[in-house]
């Protein structure tokens, strides 16, 4: 996501969480509004694999596209590992495939 979330694990979530119920941020709800008739129909909560669960996977795939994702992709892949950028934890996974279009990769 634009803020580095993965699987609805928003900034400042703890890395050890397992699958859990999350309250969606307004940014996440607005990003998904295009899939609904109005913002009122966008769910306020979701089930998410926690980062702890995600990190136990044998292989991971990270996909991003567009210039709007360029900065957060750079932060996640080359910045410090921090709960402020949840996707940054993927730096510690032994088998992550990253697929980016030219725009998303433009700051790397």
Where are each of the predicted segments found?
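Conserved phosphate- and dinucleotide-binding cores of soluble alpha/beta proteins
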Residues: 2-108
